């Protein structure tokens, strides 16, 4: 065992699911050390001790991995945004590959050789088309940035290397406006001030269209000097198309409220994924890395291997982005989603893109899909793109009961993917391949697409 606040020297033998280094005592008791890489010898101070594991703080790298690099971000060690900037991009992809293989083999009980090497980015920086940052007044100074890990302390940010560069400029201008007109933030020294006005700033940009939306989230309708804010954005932000005030007066960690007022320009901006154009409002869901989204959806379409004669189900279809991709090669695609507003947007997206061979349904996929089967729809291919918690067990049961010929599983969590693949394998399906896609470079997150066929 180890003792809290004492320092030890460890060899890092592996990495955890969040990218942290792992050392072991007697090959049993794990120590988790953020910032350490596999193969390194490190000096560590123990900060937390539990019965089955401990956490350590990296004090010094005694023998560095060849894959260690100097993080280019000035606030990397304090910010909670990225976890892997200290690793080369190759090492990041290797880690994510190992993680997916580990989940597929240990949780899914499958041969890890079915997991292909991750599809990475040519440039793993500046890939996010959306940034949302809290605004605070800390010790009398205006802070706009990210929360520190496991806290509400705002780490002031001048530039974020994974966000679009236009966001840096908007943040600078917003800070200048707050300071010039003495606009009081809602977050004051880590506490919520009911008299505070500004809560967050959000920037969205269409990478293909170059259209920019700036959203200022306020604690109520009151917004003094809003004309000056609008003027500052319109005169200084290239591609600006929309300046919006979003009102969120609730005591909550949820960033956006339900009411938005357009202060200048349009209510939405637009962007493309492949050949499809999508309208984006402040509250719209839209993948934050459009470059890799096209790669992800392209792989899903490749796995579906449609000839134009198939009827396809798209479960958890959201606003219909994957549905539209599938429509290019399918006879008909049926999208199912439990959130009514998402289905409203899906119909709008289909209409905007003149796609007619799709139909959308509000409801639980495990109820809607069997009902459509009973009405004569064929289950040639089922595509699922569930949230992080994975597929509902009832949906997996429904898929196996309707005897779908092929399943394409799009996943944002390797652990729940492994769990669900195991269930499907036990119920008549065979997993042919899993393809990781790196949607979030410099973080520990990894997306996957899996192909299953009926045995």
UniProtKB/Swiss-Prot annotation:
**Homology family:** Belongs to the class I-like SAM-binding methyltransferase superfamily. RNA M5U methyltransferase family.
One molecular function GO term is: 4 iron, 4 sulfur cluster binding
> Which PROSITE patterns does the protein's record reference?
SAM_MT_RNA_M5U, TRAM, TRMA_1
Q: What is this protein called?
A: Uncharacterized RNA methyltransferase CPE0367
Which EC main class describes this enzyme? transferase
Note the Pfam families from the entry: TRAM (PF01938), tRNA_U5-meth_tr (PF05958)
Q: What is its EC number?
A: 2.1.1.-
- Which positions are catalytic residues? 412 (nucleophile)
The UniProt annotation places [4Fe-4S] cluster binding at 73, 79, 82, 160
Enumerate the residues binding S-adenosyl-L-methionine: 287, 316, 337, 385
Would the keyword Transferase be found if you checked this record's keyword annotation?
A: yes
Any one biological process term the GO annotation gives: rRNA base methylation
Extract the CDD domains matched here: AdoMet_MTases (cd02440)
Question: Keyword annotations for this protein?
Answer: 4Fe-4S, Iron, Iron-sulfur, Metal-binding, Methyltransferase, S-adenosyl-L-methionine, Transferase
Domain TRAM, chain residue ranges per copy = 1-60
């Amino acid at each position: 065992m180890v003792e809290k606040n004492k320092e030890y020297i460890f060899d890092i033998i592996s990495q955890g699911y969040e990218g942290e280094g792992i050392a072991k005592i007697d090959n049993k008791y794990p120590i988790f050390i953020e910032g350490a890489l596999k193969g390194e010898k490190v000096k560590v101070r123990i900060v937390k001790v539990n019965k089955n594991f401990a956490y350590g703080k990296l004090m010094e790298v005694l023998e560095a991995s060849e894959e260690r690099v100097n993080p280019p971000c000035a606030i990397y060690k304090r910010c909670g945004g990225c976890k892997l900037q200290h690793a080369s991009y190759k090492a990041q992809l290797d880690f994510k590959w190992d993680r997916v293989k580990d989940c597929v083999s240990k949780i899914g009980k499958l041969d890890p050789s079915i997991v292909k090497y991750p599809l990475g980015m040519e440039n793993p920086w500046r890939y996010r088309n959306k940034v949302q940052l809290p605004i605070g007044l800390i010790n009398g100074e205006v802070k706009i940035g990210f929360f520190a890990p496991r806290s509400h302390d705002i780490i002031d940010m001048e530039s974020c290397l994974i966000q679009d560069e236009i966001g840096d400029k908007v943040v600078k201008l917003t800070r200048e406006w707050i300071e010039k007109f003495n606009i009081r933030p809602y977050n004051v020294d880590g506490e919520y001030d009911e008299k505070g006005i500004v809560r967050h700033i959000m920037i969205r940009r269409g990478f293909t269209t170059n259209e920019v939306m700036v959203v200022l989230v306020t604690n109520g309708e009151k917004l003094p000097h809003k004309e000056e804010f609008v003027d500052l954005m319109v005169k200084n932000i290239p591609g600006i198309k929309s300046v919006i005030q979003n009102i969120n007066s609730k005591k909550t960690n949820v960033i956006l409220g339900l009411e938005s007022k357009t202060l200048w320009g349009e209510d939405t901006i637009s962007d493309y994924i492949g050949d499809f154009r999508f309208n984006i409002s402040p509250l719209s869901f839209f993948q934050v890395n459009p470059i890799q989204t096209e790669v992800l959806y392209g792989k899903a379409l490749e796995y579906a291997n449609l000839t134009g004669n198939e009827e396809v189900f798209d479960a958890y279809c959201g606003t219909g982005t994957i549905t539209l991709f599938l429509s290019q090669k399918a006879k008909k695609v049926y999208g199912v989603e439990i959130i009514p507003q998402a289905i409203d947007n899906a119909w709008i997206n289909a209409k905007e893109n003149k796609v007619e061979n799709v139909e959308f349904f509000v409801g639980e996929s495990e109820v809607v899909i069997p009902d459509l089967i009973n009405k004569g729809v064929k289950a040639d291919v089922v595509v699922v793109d569930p949230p992080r918690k994975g597929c509902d067990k009832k949906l997996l049961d429904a898929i196996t009961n309707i005897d779908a010929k092929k399943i394409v599983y799009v996943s944002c969590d390797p652990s729940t993917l492994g769990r669900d693949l195991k269930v499907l394998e036990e119920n008549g399906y065979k997993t042919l391949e899993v393809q990781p896609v790196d949607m979030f470079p410099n973080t520990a997150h990894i997306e996957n697409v899996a192909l299953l066929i009926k045995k």
